[in-house]
């Protein structure tokens, strides 16, 4: 479908149209008393006025709507009739409005993660019932963002509609059949005219000028550089202040490790199996029976996380696992910067750590 335009005076009308058919989620400003320093969060809205489409970045990525921090996978029990197991897959139609390209890219990667080999019905059922309306960026969120380096600044898949701000209207790229249906049924859009195409070209030009590379080498060489730096002293130095809190994993849009626990009632008659986010930065993450810990030291855990983002996920899924959103840098209490690590890898001698 050819590009469309959405006048900003009709934006609220579109959101209300969506609210009649979906749970609508979008960036909402959080007060300072709710979040230290303030910020934004993807939340379910009750009115279009709650949306802040000028937000820089949310604290948590929108992946929580497809892959919740906690969820029940199944419940089980027994009674006079025998044993029973229920494994309901809960999903409601959801429209996520205002996803930046880095989060769209991350969601596209997670789609691959959860659909390969043994597909995950819980993630995929939510994803299949989701409508993604992206919002293109024209300038970096802040000094921590390096999406240009990681290849997530420009996306051409993973969304249903992508909005580009042209001032009094949005230029709309239609990315799916579901997006086309929304354009046709809502009545809020008009075909883009020549003037709209010209202004969008100017938007793209300003975007290209507004984002500078922050890493001194092409990140296609990152896997090779990591290979050569496995025994570098950098890992000890960079991890020295790490609290092993796992905040970097919790705010990352592409981390997907989880733990599974069975919770049984005191009467042993009922129970449930729960899934929750896990973190490879926690000391217990690689601990196994008998007390052996394959990544006991903070340096080994940090190295694994960086290798995961810059090498392992690329080998498994063909995409870098870091989108350059900068969330981990922003929220690390020890101020450990993965951007600085990427940069230092190219200049730090690969000296053995002995670990």
Predicted regions, residues:
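Iron-sulfur-associated redox domains of electron-transfer enzymes in respiratory
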Residues: 1-227
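General structural feature for long, well-ordered alpha-helical segments within catalytic domains
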Residues: 10-14, 248, 276, 337
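Residue-level detector of anion-binding/catalytic polar loops
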Residues: 23-24, 248, 328
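Ferredoxin-type iron-sulfur electron-transfer modules in oxidoreductases and energy-metabolism complexes
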Residues: 219-240, 258-355
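Extended amphipathic alpha-helical segments enriched in small hydrophobics
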Residues: 239-249
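Active-site pocket-lining segments that scaffold enzyme catalytic pockets across diverse folds
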Residues: 254
